[in-house]
Amino acid sequence: MKMAITALVLAAVVITGAVVTPARAQSGYETEPVLNAKDLAVADLLKGPHFTVNPKVPVKGFIERFTIQSSYGTFKANGLRMLPIRVNEVEALAKLDDLSKTKEFAEAAGKAIARPVTSTVNMLAHPVDTITGFPDGVGRLFDRIKLGGERVYQAATAPGASGGERASEASKRVGMATINAMGFEKERRDLAKSLGVDPYTTNEVLSEKLTDAAWVAFSGRFLIQTTTSILVPYSMAMSAATITNSTVYDTPPGDLINNATMIFGSTGATDAQVQALVQNPQYSLTTLTELAMGIQRLQGVPGRDAVVIFAAAARTQDECRFVAGAINMLARYHEAVAPIAQVSAPGPILGRTAGGALVVPMPVDYVAWLERLGVAANRPDLQAPEKVAFISGRMTPRAQKEFTKRGWKISESFTTAAER
């Protein structure tokens, strides 16, 4: 399964001569291009029975932004890693649609009690990814981030808040269902697992459909997994949840939050700093768990508290996924290449080996030579006898040249799938 996922994603990043060359800005820097989808992903991820991916893919903030037109709506896949996830979700929607039309499901729906009128799926009323002022992909995270005076979330530092109150606030995040009937939440997780999708998906349409179907199964005593075979063609791609080794499927959400809180606290971060991260609603529970597991893989490495503080400042779901991906890339380097002796996160996340090498993980798709990179490459705190950047995607020839000229070694296609 893992090999299939890796092969699919790696095949999707093969670059041909047809890829658009980024324009050269008058300042000497490049501008981010619009690429051709057919040059980025295999055909099966671009068109299927229920979806078509737009042929043009703009790059913004180092992230390739795919648009998926489907029978169930238009969906955005920000990043090559997200494309198979969103495509799989469309196929899952088709299966749920087919399921809802069966005689058995109709009978179960007739037996089911009414869903609580207050039940819903927590989706941000105005997703920060689209708010004017944050249209930047993950580019902001390569700048120095001013964290000292920034109050990320007031609730995180509210005096007198009990543990229960803070846990309640932590559950108010993107992708969380709010039906509290005993046993329902597990039914929903099991359904998501059978479909090969993230139970805490940020796809609002799928999340609501999962809740609807799981409620019928739970309340109407309809055995979905035994009565109906749900096999999704793109389940080989699975979801972001695969990075957590099925933890998000098998563990109640309250336990996931408590486990993440404990791991973040073990870094030496203060309670207020930990709560600022845990209560950041832009982190889906899956991404928060992925981040916690990455930090745990670096257990004992000084400086992990800086990652907690940095992670809490994420403003968008793109930035949250970047932080989680970066720390897991760094953990893989620590485990497989050379031990990391120190972690810091001035913007971006950095690792230093005992030999003094500087390691920068970059879970991004496409790196053009932008002005912010020119500034970052010359920063005093980003200098070392040996400097290595690992990129899950690739750089333009110009960016490669400029980084190499400044003493950097670049490793491309260091895929996030390989973190596992």
Residue ranges, per PLM feature:
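Membrane-engaging insertion elements
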Residues: 138-160, 236-279
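Sec/Tat signal peptide C-region and signal peptidase I cleavage site
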Residues: 19-25
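Amphipathic interfacial helices
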Residues: 94-147, 165-232
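Bacterial N-terminal signal peptides
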Residues: 7-18
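Domain-level recognition of nuclease-like catalytic cores that cleave nucleotide substrates
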Residues: 394-420
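Acidic-basic catalytic patches of nuclease active cores, encompassing PD-(D/E)XK
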Residues: 263-348
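Cationic, glycine-rich low-complexity segments
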Residues: 26-155
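Conserved catalytic cores of phosphodiester-cleaving nucleases, focusing on short active-site segments
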Residues: 322-382, 386-391
